[in-house]
Every structure is written in C-alpha cells, then in structure tokens.
Amino acid sequence: MSKIFVNPSAIRAGLADLEMAEETVDLINRNVEDNQAHLQGEPIEVEALPEDMRRLHISEQKHSQLSDSACGKEEGSDDDFYMADSEDPYVPMQSYLDNVGIQIVKKMKTGERFFKIWSQAVEEIISYVTVNFPLPSGKSTDDKSTQTVSERSRQNPQPSSVKKEDQLSKTKVVSQEASGPPALEWSATNDEDDASVEAEIAHQIAESFSKKYKFPSRSSGIFLYNFEQLKTNLDDIVREAKRIPGVMRLAQDGLRLPLRCILGWVASTHSKRFQILVDSDKLSKIMQDDINRYLAY
C-alpha cells in the first residue's frame, strides 16, 4: 500500500477554518434571536386593554376625507406659489432668448465678428426687456436693503451728504492724477448712465475692435495698438470710456466717438506695456485734441 503523507500545518489550517465557521454560525443565530426578541414575549390580549381603549373606533372613511382635504390644501398652496405657463412672463422671454442664441450661432457661422453680433444682440435684448417689462411708475426703484437709516439721520442729512461729496471729489481728483494722463482736462462732467448709451459705446468699440491706431512712443517713433491687445473685457472698456469727458454726450446724440482717445485712456490705465512704450505727454495731447475735435462737430 502506498502511504499518503499529510502536512500537519494543513491539518491545523483546516481546523482553524472549521472553528471560524462555527463561530460565524453562532453569531448569525444570536443576531436572528436578537432581532426576533419582540416575538418571543407573551402576546397582548385585547381583553387586558383599559376601558378607554375599547371606546376608540377607527373610521377609514374619515381618514380618507382627512387625507383628501390635506392633499387639496397642498395643491392649493402649490397653485398659489406657481403660475401657469400662460401667465408667467418669463416663458416667452426664454423662448425669445433661445431664438436670439440661434441667430447668433447662424451669424457666427457666416463669418461675422463676434463683438459686432453681440452688440446687436444686446441692443435687441435691452429693447425687448424695456418693452415687455416696464418699470412701475408709482413705485420707487431704490434698493430697500439700503433704506435702514434712522429717523434722526433722515431729519438732518445735510452735513453728512456735504462731507461725502467733498470726499468723493477729493478721491476723484486723486485717482485722476494717479492714473490718467497729466495734461488731460477733466473739467467736463458726464451725464447720467443710460443703458442705450452704454450699448452705443459698446457697439462702436466692437466695430473697431481690431482696427489699428497709432500712438507716439517714448523714442518719438510711432507704434500701433488696438483694443484686442488690451485683453480686457468689453464691459470694462465701456465702463472706463464713460469716465472720459464728452463721451456720454456723443453717445447720447448717436455721433461717432473718439475711439483713439478711448483706447489711449483705457490702455494707459490697464496695460503696463502700453505705459512703458507710450509718451504720456504726447498721448494726453492727442487725447485732448481728439475730444475737442469730436465735440466741435
């Protein structure tokens, strides 16, 4: 007979596995017993209940009526909170914006410049909003969050307002001296901001976005510069252009804007490379001459 030798370590490993299996079975049984502990107690008999509990009667009809009334209240509250699609004014506006987006994509496929397309779309959207969402005449447009002044400060607002105006005038002078060309005259004041005026400024700037302009360099030479080299957002350019005297008035009248002057001003405040290359004295003279020439027409 052939002898079969079994390694003692394999026997020990098998015994350990059997012990682990037995422990696992015991653990499962204990968990089952713990989970079913509430079923092992004595059942509650109805006869042992107090007398008050016998008087309770459950009516399914009343419960259904209560649930129906609760659902009705919830539906009513939802109807009060949400408007129908026919009454919601933002539904046609959403469809209008979708159509505008489709038109923009079509124009971009034809090869038109994006800034020209976008300026036209902005004007159309502004006109749509002003026509379909007019401001109520009887209500004030002031922000309620800022109207937290006490009654005493409302009765005597003159000293604080005078101080604020003085501080604003001082800060304007300091900022103009620090950032603007030194020889540019800032005596003229811009008119009130208007969305149509901003759209006109943005439209003219976008039309000439890549047009080359000439500026005198520090070496008395001439170098070219345009709005694209600024790498600045169009909204920021328009915001800076409104600070130039006379630009708002020209835009309100629909006249041509001094784009070289606008570019020189924005570049002198936002582009360090432009500040290094350009001669500030010659630049300020060019900007002042452009403003005077355009305002004279």
Swiss-Prot record:
InterPro entries registered for this protein in UniProt: PP_M1-like, PP_M1_C, RABV_P-like_C
GO molecular function, one term: RNA-directed RNA polymerase activity
Phosphoserine sites (modified residues): S64, S210, S271
Region Disordered, annotated ranges: 137-191
GO biological process: symbiont-mediated suppression of host innate immune response; symbiont-mediated suppression of host JAK-STAT cascade via inhibition of STAT1 activity; symbiont-mediated suppression of host JAK-STAT cascade via inhibition of STAT2 activity; symbiont-mediated suppression of host type I interferon-mediated signaling pathway; viral transcription
Similarity section: Belongs to the lyssavirus protein P family.
Keyword Phosphoprotein: yes
Source species: Khujand virus
Domain of life: Viruses
Classification via Pfam families: PP_M1 (PF03012)
GO cellular component, one term: virion component
Record's comment on post-translational modification: Phosphorylated by host PKC and by an unknown kinase.
Job description of the protein: Non catalytic polymerase cofactor and regulatory protein that plays a role in viral transcription and replication. Stabilizes the RNA polymerase L to the N-RNA template and binds the soluble protein N, preventing it from encapsidating non-genomic RNA. Also inhibits host IFN-alpha and IFN-beta signaling by binding and retaining phosphorylated STAT1 in the cytoplasm or by inhibiting the DNA binding of STAT1 in the nucleus.
Positions occupied by motif Nuclear export signal: 49-58
Upper taxonomic lineage: Viruses, Riboviria, Orthornavirae, Negarnaviricota, Haploviricotina
Biased composition (Polar residues): 146-161
SUPFAM superfamilies for the chain: Phosphoprotein M1, C-terminal domain
Protein name: Phosphoprotein
Subunit text: Homotrimer when phosphorylated. This trimer is stabilized by binding to the L protein. Binds soluble protein N, and ribonucleocapsid. Interacts with host STAT1, STAT2 and PML.
Keyword set, alphabetical order: Chaperone, Host cytoplasm, Host nucleus, Host-virus interaction, Inhibition of host innate immune response by virus, Inhibition of host interferon signaling pathway by virus, Inhibition of host STAT1 by virus, Inhibition of host STAT2 by virus, Interferon antiviral system evasion, Phosphoprotein, Viral immunoevasion, Viral RNA replication, Virion
Short sequence motif named Nuclear localization signal, residue ranges: 211-214
